[in-house]
Design a protein with these regions (language model features):
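Glycine-rich flexible loops
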Residues: 1-132
Length: 132
């Protein structure tokens, strides 16, 4: 139940960009998973990390990391949208992108599938960080 004092997420514009651009998108999930964020802090591209793990790349398309930008900013929203889409189009081609020093954003038909994309990448980041 929402109260009259409820405020939308500061990341509302990021969610809006992604929802408007993809007819199949029903859920945009933005989280701050520890291991994904740590891997990006080490300078790693999430899309490169998952290449060695077929259980991820078979089911989850990971795009390039978004550079460090201010949280809740229009710049972060636009950069996230750009990272998830195909070269100057609004066609979304990735399921998830990392946002350096911030978190990740995933899209899917429902929140559970979007969360599963995040969970897969988080699991691999934990493995890679433990092995390094």
């Amino acid at each position: 139940m929402m109260t009259k004092h409820a405020k939308p997420s500061g990341e509302l514009s990021m969610h809006g960009f992604l929802q408007r651009s993809h007819n199949k998108t029903k859920a945009v999930v933005h989280l701050h998973p520890t291991y994904c964020t740590a891997a990006m802090y080490r300078g790693w591209q999430l899309c490169d990390i998952v290449k060695d793990f077929p259980e991820v790349f078979r089911y989850t398309k990971v795009g390039p990391n978004v550079p460090k930008l201010e949280a809740t900013s229009h710049e972060l929203a636009q950069a996230t949208f750009d990272a998830m889409t195909y070269a100057d189009t609004s066609k979304i081609i990735y399921d998830i992108v990392g946002q350096e020093c911030h978190g990740v954003t995933a899209i899917a038909a429902n929140p559970w599938d979007a969360f599963e994309h995040i969970e897969r990448v988080e699991h691999i980041c934990k493995i890679v960080l433990a092995a390094s």
